[in-house]
């Protein structure tokens, strides 16, 4: 029976790296075949997942020999960290492998929004239309960007935004005031309300917790200057989508880009369909060929290290160290 089971897509170089050290089963469709997965869990010691495999008590109970879980990404919504810690199972995310990747996506979204949808004009132009007056664009230079959360990805966004002449403000109560990272921001905000009121563009970079769920609700959106833009590449539940749709339809909000939604995938005919000035993408801000390779190699190496009794190069998320 395999020592390592990989249930979702992983770059082949990462698969080869772990398979050279442990008997490995790689089947990216296992996440959708629970009975087949259950049969492999009985003897597996290492499990590698993306964001769909639910690593919770029912799965852990079927994997009595499990020692470590490798997460091909950084979000941990699908992994019960407390249950893993109680079972003595380490959780090793792909920390740092897509920070720059996501920040590039955020900047692309920012430029698309501030250009008033000009990058979505292909079909009209190809059909013979010439809608030059339809697009109400703004220069990026001189705008004020507010970052909610100031971790690794947000800091990369700050670096790139400042290169465009954008003023950067940030809010993060978990980053100490003396942290040198604040040098990347022009302004450190004491609360979300202050940040919203002084931002032309807001980009969200916080995990989904009970504290952050619907952090951006109707009241928060009302604090933004008229015509402001909102970008979310973090977690869908941080924004109250119905409040967002109302703000876009009323024209109070100039535009929004969502790479993450409260329900993924979005149901056909959902409240997000046909909303003006709303750009959607299928949770791909951190996915490029390069980022997937980096994550796959890092996770493969760290899972192998953990199973060999070595020291992984990333912190164990289940124990916070």
Kindly label every feature range from the protein language model.
Residues 55-59, 173-271:
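Rossmann-like adenosine-cofactor binding region
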Residues 154-155:
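N-terminal Rossmann-fold NAD(P) dinucleotide-binding loop
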Residues 105, 227-321:
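Rossmann-like dinucleotide-binding domain for NAD(H)/NADP(H)
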Residues 1-92, 197, 217, 223:
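An N-terminal-biased, well-structured beta-alpha scaffold segment characteristic
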Residues 7, 50, 72, 109, ...:
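Short, well-ordered coil/turn residues at beta-beta hairpins
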Residues 87, 95-144, 159, 178:
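Phosphate-binding beta-alpha-beta segment of Rossmann-like dinucleotide-binding domains, i.e.
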């Amino acid at each position: 029976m395999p020592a390592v089971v990989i249930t979702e897509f992983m770059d082949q170089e990462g698969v080869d790296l772990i398979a050279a050290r442990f008997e490995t089963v790689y089947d990216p469709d296992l996440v959708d075949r629970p009975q087949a997965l259950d049969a492999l869990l009985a003897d597996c010691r290492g499990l590698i997942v993306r964001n769909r495999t639910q690593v919770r008590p029912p799965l852990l109970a079927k994997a009595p020999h499990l020692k470590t879980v490798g997460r091909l990404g950084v979000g941990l919504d699908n992994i019960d960290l407390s249950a893993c810690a109680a079972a003595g199972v380490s959780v090793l995310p792909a920390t740092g492998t897509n920070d720059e990747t996501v920040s590039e996506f955020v900047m692309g979204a920012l430029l698309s929004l501030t250009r008033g949808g000009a990058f979505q004009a292909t079909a009209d132009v190809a059909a013979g239309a010439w809608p030059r007056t339809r697009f109400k664009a703004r220069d990026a230079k001189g705008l004020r960007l507010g970052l909610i959360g100031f971790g690794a990805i947000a800091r990369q966004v700050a670096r790139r935004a400042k290169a465009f002449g954008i003023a950067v403000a940030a809010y993060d109560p978990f980053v100490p005031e003396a942290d040198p990272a604040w040098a990347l921001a022009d302004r450190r905000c004491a609360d979300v309300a202050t940040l919203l009121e002084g931002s032309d563009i807001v980009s969200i970079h916080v995990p989904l917790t009970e504290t952050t769920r619907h952090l951006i609700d109707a009241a928060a959106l009302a604090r933004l200057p008229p015509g402001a833009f909102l970008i979310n590449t973090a977690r869908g539940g941080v924004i109250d989508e119905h409040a967002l749709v109302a703000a876009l339809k009323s024209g109070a909000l100039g535009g929004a880009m969502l790479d993450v939604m409260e329900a993924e995938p979005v149901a056909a005919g959902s409240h997000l369909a046909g909303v003006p000035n709303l750009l959607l993408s299928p949770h791909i801000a951190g996915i490029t060929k390069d980022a997937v390779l980096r994550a796959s190699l890092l996770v493969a190496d760290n899972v192998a290290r953990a199973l060999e009794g070595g020291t992984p190069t990333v912190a164990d998320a289940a124990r916070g160290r």
